[in-house]
């Protein structure tokens, strides 16, 4: 569990624990750079950060020793592990909790790993949310909360609304995040432009979002330049995760690829169009029924994980026309005239 989207997919575990143990204080250990996506969750008491992958060896050791000292002092009754990483198992060994649960990973059969926990739970489910929830089996819980949660403060939406007003965006807008961490998860820029044109011709304003990197911003710029009418790009690279959650929550539709914003859209119950390529589209799909998902494997055979070319856009086989048809299904009515006039 390394990335922002992964963190959202753990929230049903947090909610289920809080639902069954309402007086419990729930702390979470995660990578430092993923903290913002859960920073507004009211069910979490405290967030503790593990050094990111790029940190130096000395900084990592210092971070782990500091975490051990802090977490030991918290005197936990229960520790739940949702990752197969050795560092976490060794850290758990240092905590005096009465009950320590991990999932039973087939590739983690070493005695040191097994003895780091008091219980090893069999893994169940075809989706990561179901698999995460299966770790609670040793607790005998029967009442599960299965929705993901993306929390944000009211001030986040107030800020986004002010920004949207300044950009001339009305109520019926669509958020599109075309970028992902790796190119093999991305779709063609010109196809995004075609989808945007189709939406804007029906009166919907399109807000493009992305991360702050130069590559992400260049992608958004190229897509915008390929459109007949330029979409809204003023928020690209400028939203924190809670603000992005607020922005997507108030959108009429979200369109994206295999990345965290799709999971945010699912969590806030905004309709989703999601495009997947050479990744597990069942296991990692946004956890919602209000979704139209495109998998490149339905158009062309996808490579196995070991054959994957990370510099290839596998999503290119998905036609823009199919995605446009999906927008018409999820948004069967044109935007109200007030929104259409805002684009003039």
Curated annotation (Swiss-Prot):
GO terms for molecular function: ADP-heptose-lipopolysaccharide heptosyltransferase activity; lipopolysaccharide core heptosyltransferase activity. Disruption phenotype: Disruption of the gene, which likely inactivates the entire waa operon due to downstream polarity, leads to a mutant (MD42) that grows and survives in vitro in undiluted, highly viscous cecal mucus isolated directly from the mouse cecum, but is unable to colonize the mouse large intestine. Mutant MD42 is hypersensitive to sodium dodecyl sulfate (SDS), bile salts and the hydrophobic antibiotic novobiocin. Furthermore, its LPS core oligosaccharide is truncated. Pathway: Bacterial outer membrane biogenesis; LPS core biosynthesis. GO terms for biological process: lipopolysaccharide core region biosynthetic process. It catalyses: an L-alpha-D-Hep-(1->3)-4-O-phospho-L-alpha-D-Hep-(1->5)-[alpha-Kdo-(2->4)]-alpha-Kdo-(2->6)-lipid A + ADP-L-glycero-beta-D-manno-heptose = an L-alpha-D-Hep-(1->7)-L-alpha-D-Hep-(1->3)-4-O-phospho-L-alpha-D-Hep-(1->5)-[alpha-Kdo-(2->4)]-alpha-Kdo-(2->6)-lipid A + ADP + H(+); L-alpha-D-Hep-(1->3)-4-O-phospho-L-alpha-D-Hep-(1->5)-[alpha-Kdo-(2->4)]-alpha-Kdo-(2->6)-lipid A (E. coli) + ADP-L-glycero-beta-D-manno-heptose = L-alpha-D-Hep-(1->7)-L-alpha-D-Hep-(1->3)-4-O-phospho-L-alpha-D-Hep-(1->5)-[alpha-Kdo-(2->4)]-alpha-Kdo-(2->6)-lipid A (E. coli) + ADP + H(+). GO terms for cellular component: cytosol. It comes from the Bacteria. It is an enzyme of class 2 (transferase). Glycosyltransferase involved in the biosynthesis of the core oligosaccharide region of lipopolysaccharide (LPS). Catalyzes the addition of the third heptose unit (HepIII) to the second heptose unit (HepII) of the phospho-Hep2-Kdo2-lipid A module. Belongs to the glycosyltransferase 9 family. This is Lipopolysaccharide heptosyltransferase 3. It comes from Escherichia coli (strain K12). The gene is waaQ.
